[in-house]
């Protein structure tokens, strides 16, 4: 075992002395050492319950003959970090989480790992670490929050963001805004729609790195505790059989994840995270592949913000395995792949029926015959950009309008809130990319302001930043190359006509080649906004959105 280096032989007496100091018995030291990565903290609603999950995992590991040892991982609440400088620090934590987990696992020679994440960057960061370390690993998340209720209708985090826009537009009272504030987030857990956290927890299940139910069992259900115990027991089987992350997260598994991403209508952030996780597994996952998969994958689920169902309804309808079973009627999944259950995908999903055909549409009656996410290209985004097609109003799938250009989120939000953006406009927010931000902030506040003011069917927003999974509307992000490196988005001027055709996967602005070259010759790179600390290091190493904003090691 890996832990033999710190537990066996006379040479390991100093290490055993320190393990004794932990209160471990001789018998515990001789068992496999299972690291449990706890992301518990008291600032993230989706992580406040993880101590309960961790204790259940520890019980499961002990029941199956292992020695559980807990160590921490950080986690940011994107909702709390939203709309201020804190959002620059969200995406960057994905790599901090991967790096620090690698360091802890290697330094202490764990035999296996159980990852306990829940929210946005925490899940992909730990998946990246798992792929990088390639020691037996299983995931069990904290689970989704239950939806709230206002006026008898279910609501979630996206509802409060749009309520702010409605209040600023004079459409609701301050009292109604306060009601939304007090009711949209009624329990612990990851926010209740198909936002980024739940998207990634569901896709972890699809990849084969978590047991069935991981993405959908609500945080407050006792089944979540049972799932954690089963995960703790299962890791011992994975260790015995030496089933490792790269055995599970194969190229075919990532294609399954992209397919299910389209079927579920996941967050556009998945288009950043899946390539980054694949990269750590030694697999190149080109985002262009998404359109090929989308073209043959029907969108079966419209969970919030795209629709009025929530993850709790998806759980009751049969969960991710039921959606996989439905999609597999079209033979779109590789089902012979091994998973963390010790069984194949086919064995996992066998008999998992669709219990609610309103929540999970049959393949014969999908929301659309193509997937929930689209990759667009054109002279505005030569390398690519991304949009959550399933959350775009039908009338905005094709749009043409004048550019309203802003060089930061704050200026754009002020213009929207003061009525300077009108029907037909295309809001451009640039210098918010991975390097330019730095940190690629989410533009939830501007998109929510657009929706809240009733402009969701007439105004588009384009950015080299990214979006919260709670965003809906014609919100097009991850424009690559970004403005900070001289991408064409930096050359757009106020009033330029922008042409968006989501069904044709195109995005352009009207300009002659001569004028484009003239603007390019006049463009000058901007000085970095931040020159010290982690963000400065991050900006110097990060790649573009179309590559998953991975960090590139400098060549010496």
Curated annotation (Swiss-Prot):
Pathways per UniProt: Amino-acid biosynthesis; L-isoleucine biosynthesis; L-isoleucine from 2-oxobutanoate: step 3/4; Amino-acid biosynthesis; L-valine biosynthesis; L-valine from pyruvate: step 3/4
Active site: 468 (proton acceptor)
GO cellular component terms given for this protein: cytosol
Enzyme class of the recorded protein, top EC level: lyase
Protein residues bound to Mg(2+): 78, 120-121, 442
A Pfam family per the record: ILVD_EDD_N
Binding site for [2Fe-2S] cluster: 119, 191
GO molecular function, one term: 2 iron, 2 sulfur cluster binding
EC number: 4.2.1.9
Reactions listed under catalytic activity: (2R)-2,3-dihydroxy-3-methylbutanoate = 3-methyl-2-oxobutanoate + H2O; (2R,3R)-2,3-dihydroxy-3-methylpentanoate = (S)-3-methyl-2-oxopentanoate + H2O
Subunit structure: Homodimer.
PANTHER family found in the cross-reference section: D-XYLONATE DEHYDRATASE, D-XYLONATE DEHYDRATASE YAGF-RELATED
Function: Functions in the biosynthesis of branched-chain amino acids. Catalyzes the dehydration of (2R,3R)-2,3-dihydroxy-3-methylpentanoate (2,3-dihydroxy-3-methylvalerate) into 2-oxo-3-methylpentanoate (2-oxo-3-methylvalerate) and of (2R)-2,3-dihydroxy-3-methylbutanoate (2,3-dihydroxyisovalerate) into 2-oxo-3-methylbutanoate (2-oxoisovalerate), the penultimate precursor to L-isoleucine and L-valine, respectively.
Name of the molecule in the record: Dihydroxy-acid dehydratase
